[in-house]
Amino acid sequence: MTTGAPPFSGSSPQTTRPQTVAEKILSQRGSAAVYAGDLAVVEVDQVMVVDSIAQSFIERMERDLGAVPKYPERVSIVVDHVAPASTVSVAQAQKEAREYAAKTGVRLFDVGRGICHQVLMEEKLAQPGWIVLGSDSHSTTYGAVAAFGSGMGATDIALAAASGKTWLRVPESVKVTLTGDLRPGVTAKDVALEMIRVLGADGATYQSVEIHAGDRFTRGERMTLANLCVEAGAKAGLVVPGGEILTDYGYDVPAWVYPDEGAAYAREVEIDLSALHPRMSAPSEVDNVHDVAELRGLKVDQVFIGTCTNGRIEDLHAAAEVLRGRRVDPTTRLLVIPASSQVMEEALQDGTLLTLQRAGAVLGTPGCGPCMGRHQGVLAPGEVCVSTSNRNFIGRMGDKDAHIYLASPAVAAATAVMGRVALPEDVAQVAASA
């Protein structure tokens, strides 16, 4: 099945002043040049529906609109949020999603294929310059490849599927410039958390966060950066292509997708990467960010490595590097859930999963796992969890009295070994003194 995305016109709409990346994409996918504050009607290249909203989506399509997807090849249903099904009602909803996909010809990525954003990226269903709408708030992830990715509810998603288009107000853009080089042990997750700290939890509400990273970071690391943008309230998170980063993965990067010099930004911030240390978000807001060293020693009941933020192969490699030849602390549980079946297969083939399992990790089916607190490792009252996920709100992963700390895979793995918040060097020091 082809992507079915409408071809680019080959020439950009006539503009009157410099544009940001968001303005360029929305102009290219619309009928005229648009700028922040304008209303735009645009072509949608891919619509993504997750299992937890599939029933509502189907109801909107069939009962409210009396419609079928205009372009079935541009619609994907992903069973990932509660997969495998945890209750009869969840199983019924997933059954209806499968039946709908078979009836209408839309793509179906069923139980075990993985998390929606990881799967669509692997399937190349997000491309530079595209508009990708998802029924999941972390659809900003597609900005890793300079696609305008944004989360919407069932009604807007259904309208986009039925018509092939959507309308929206063109967002203002916030320019985030990354300078310097990362210290050893500092990762893209630390950069993302620092970015949210600087912007604030609502500091980019209905804005496009445009990240200027040069040729730094892999595609997976760029996914982490774009993924977290919604935690500042962003409508989209766009990482400007740099060097050969995207072409190395086989993407065709159109020349027009880069921002113009002199484009107007609502706000500009600069982050010096060389000044960063490993970071951790403490309860119960993502922008409550501290150096890990400040929280070192906090007792932890559960560690979770996975999600659309940090469940990729490089994340599992980072965790395995810390855990190799060691054991998880007996008072701490370690859950590891690969972001997709492709990640799981690669981790099986190179021995990563064996390393994790021998260390005492509990391995789960590719998918969202306990991230949203519905199955596969929810937290009891008073429990403390260090997670590589993207949200630490009250009640997010289980009981409202549980406490969630967000960190990188390496810090999460070190914490699992020590049973307390720790850095990888803490694990190495203990081993050296043994």
From Swiss-Prot:
InterPro entries: Acnase/IPM_dHydase_lsu_aba_1/3, Acoase/IPM_deHydtase_lsu_aba, Aconitase_4Fe-4S_BS, Aconitase_4Fe-4S_dom, HAcnase/IPMdehydase_lsu_prok, Homoacnase/IPMdehydase_lsu, IPM_dehydratase_rel_enz. Keywords: 4Fe-4S, Amino-acid biosynthesis, Branched-chain amino acid biosynthesis, Iron, Iron-sulfur, Leucine biosynthesis, Lyase, Metal-binding. Its cofactor is [4Fe-4S] cluster. The keyword DNA-binding does not apply. It comes from the Bacteria. It is an enzyme of class 4 (lyase). [4Fe-4S] cluster binds at residues 308, 368, 371. Its EC number is 4.2.1.33. Pathway: Amino-acid biosynthesis; L-leucine biosynthesis; L-leucine from 3-methyl-2-oxobutanoate: step 2/4. One of its GO terms (molecular function) is metal ion binding. Binds 1 [4Fe-4S] cluster per subunit. It catalyses: (2R,3S)-3-isopropylmalate = (2S)-2-isopropylmalate. SUPFAM superfamilies: Aconitase iron-sulfur domain. One of its GO terms (biological process) is L-leucine biosynthetic process. Heterodimer of LeuC and LeuD. NCBIfam families: hacA_fam, IPMI_arch, PRK00402.1. Belongs to the aconitase/IPM isomerase family. LeuC type 2 subfamily. PANTHER family: 3-ISOPROPYLMALATE DEHYDRATASE LARGE SUBUNIT 1 (PTHR43822:SF21), HOMOACONITASE, MITOCHONDRIAL-RELATED (PTHR43822). Catalyzes the isomerization between 2-isopropylmalate and 3-isopropylmalate, via the formation of 2-isopropylmaleate. This is 3-isopropylmalate dehydratase large subunit 1. The gene is leuC1.
